[in-house]
């Protein structure tokens, strides 16, 4: 996902629904960028914090228990999503506020009504299953209903 978003050291990555924190940890370790993980589940926040500490990336990664649907995304240059399609769609109003040029990437699920710039098929090394990674660039263009 991070490669598809073309993350660099200068990016600020926001992972919405960060789960165990693997994306923000990878962003910090592989690219040396600042990364923020957000989740509402206290158990997932603890897992993320443990993962950050275990990987010694506390100086680059921040984990917050916060509602992703009210989150200020103005500082993000990359937003990662691994959420159900209905949640991706619910995030559209927030994603429309991203600064121009910001990248959004989603694992497996697109956003109904918003055409991705590109879709990348990837095959998981662990099990050989193919997944899709979708990428959008802000400002996103929502299709008008006819």
Regions inferred by a protein language model and the residue ranges of each:
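A short SAM/SAH-binding and catalytic strip from SAM-dependent methyltransferases
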Residues: 74-90
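S-adenosyl-L-methionine
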Residues: 45-75
